[in-house]
Amino acid sequence: MTAHIISGTAVAKQVKANIAEQIQAYTAQDKRKPGLAVILVGMDPASQVYVNSKRKSCAEIGIESKSYDLPAETGEAELLAIIEQLNHDDSVDGILVQLPLPKQIDATKVTEAIVPHKDVDGFHPYNVGRLCQKIPTLRSCTPYGVMKLLESTGVNLAGLHAVVVGASNIVGRPMAMELLLAGCTVTITHSRTKDLAYHVSQADIVVAGVGKPNFVKGEWIKPGAIVIDVGINRVEGKLIGDVEYSAAEAKASFITPVPGGVGPMTVAMLMQNTLQAYQVHLQAV
């Protein structure tokens, strides 16, 4: 068996085309464009790449992107003051603060400072809590993107056993909640999980997000499983995932590549969240 490749690039293109169409319909009615404020603190090269990708997507689909590039020595109070100003700016529907932040800034405090209806990253405890209570509004972009990729396979997820490798706040935990919402039986594994290979071998769906290259071995994969690789690791100038790709591809029914899998979907779902926040904002005016 050789797995079908789930192209995040292709699915993201469809999502963004649909968003662009909806924005054009609003602007044709003399409505303003959606607005997204993107805040970058410092000059971390990876963060710059991610931020530029988000700004480029905004330009492509008709979202007004407002850039705030701040020096690495920016203080917490200064950043919080900018967020407070954006919270009250009616031309801004979404606020994104690129993580990680410099050590002098408390990321939790910053995340919680963004009003929940402008939290297009889906990190605010209010939005995470709504997902846990089965009433999601703005959803965490990477897990939301993974669900769109799973949807694109046409496989009915209800009743399948999903194993999430990694329990981070950004991927693992909200990912488990998304899969639970889709009717999966979910196992979350983490750094203290015993016999990880066994747990992975029982999975109909494996979602790997630990940030360790080739961490999930191909031999662990159950024949016919769906493998979603969230990891992006740079090794000897190449981008590789958390899953041992070639060996896993030989056993899986569907698999995402790295690059070109989950990455493009994270940005696409950020755009989707911004559109959603904009639509709510328009209804409230």
Swiss-Prot record:
InterPro entries found in the cross-reference section: Aminoacid_DH-like_N_sf, NAD(P)-bd_dom_sf, THF_DH/CycHdrlase, THF_DH/CycHdrlase_cat_dom, THF_DH/CycHdrlase_CS, THF_DH/CycHdrlase_NAD-bd_dom
Any one GO biological process: purine nucleotide biosynthetic process
Keyword Oxidoreductase attached: yes
Keyword Iron: no
Binding site for NADP(+): G166, A167, S168, S191, I232
Protein EC: 1.5.1.5, 3.5.4.9
GO cellular component, one term: cytosol
Alphabetical UniProt keywords: Amino-acid biosynthesis, Histidine biosynthesis, Hydrolase, Methionine biosynthesis, Multifunctional enzyme, NADP, One-carbon metabolism, Oxidoreductase, Purine biosynthesis
One annotated GO molecular function: methenyltetrahydrofolate cyclohydrolase activity
Coiled-coil residue spans: none
Pfam families: THF_DHG_CYH, THF_DHG_CYH_C
Associated pathway: One-carbon metabolism; tetrahydrofolate interconversion
Catalytic activity: (6R)-5,10-methylene-5,6,7,8-tetrahydrofolate + NADP(+) = (6R)-5,10-methenyltetrahydrofolate + NADPH; (6R)-5,10-methenyltetrahydrofolate + H2O = (6R)-10-formyltetrahydrofolate + H(+)
Subunit structure: Homodimer.
Family, per entry: Belongs to the tetrahydrofolate dehydrogenase/cyclohydrolase family.
Function as written in the Swiss-Prot or TrEMBL entry: Catalyzes the oxidation of 5,10-methylenetetrahydrofolate to 5,10-methenyltetrahydrofolate and then the hydrolysis of 5,10-methenyltetrahydrofolate to 10-formyltetrahydrofolate.
Protein name, per record: Bifunctional protein FolD
